[in-house]
UniProtKB/Swiss-Prot annotation:
One of its GO terms (cellular component) is extracellular space. The gene is TotF. Residues 1-22 form the signal peptide. It comes from Drosophila sechellia. A humoral factor that may play a role in stress tolerance. Keywords: Immunity, Innate immunity, Secreted, Signal. Belongs to the Turandot family. It comes from the Eukaryota. The keyword Secreted applies. GO terms for biological process: cellular response to heat; cellular response to UV; innate immune response; response to bacterium; response to heat; response to UV; response to virus. This is Protein Turandot F. It is found in: Secreted.
């Protein structure tokens, strides 16, 4: 799940930065470049990307209105964020649950492919 989310948002960020819309807000530009440095670099390991996933979700929540998404893509991204939050809020014996990446891959793969096209 996490990897697919990362690549989906990464593609959106790349498109947005490439369009030049980020130049008006230096904080947005800086954060977007940080996200791209982590998630856009194929040499960054999966653990590092997983560790930075909360920052990516926070970035999306803060700047989602500025990202050029279709209504369908925005609804899908919001559902993914909601599911991510729900999964992280699940607790087993008072400790956050581990795993669950397979479901996320299945949910996000079509979205990642649609953005890429």
């Amino acid at each position: 799940m996490k990897t697919v989310i990362l690549f989906s948002f990464l593609l959106v960020l790349l498109g947005y930065l490439g369009a030049g819309h980020a130049q008006r807000d230096p904080e947005f530009t800086s954060r977007a470049r940080q996200m791209l440095a982590v998630f856009g670099n194929s040499e960054v390991d999966r653990y590092t990307k997983s560790r930075n996933l909360p920052a990516l979700i926070e970035f999306y929540e803060k700047y989602s209105s500025r990202l050029p998404l279709t209504v369908q893509d925005r609804n899908f991204a919001n559902n993914v964020v909601r599911r991510y939050r729900a999964q992280n809020n699940q607790q087993v014996d008072g400790v956050p649950a581990q795993g669950g990446i397979g479901l996320a891959f299945a949910l996000l793969l079509p979205f990642a492919k649609a953005i890429r096209e």
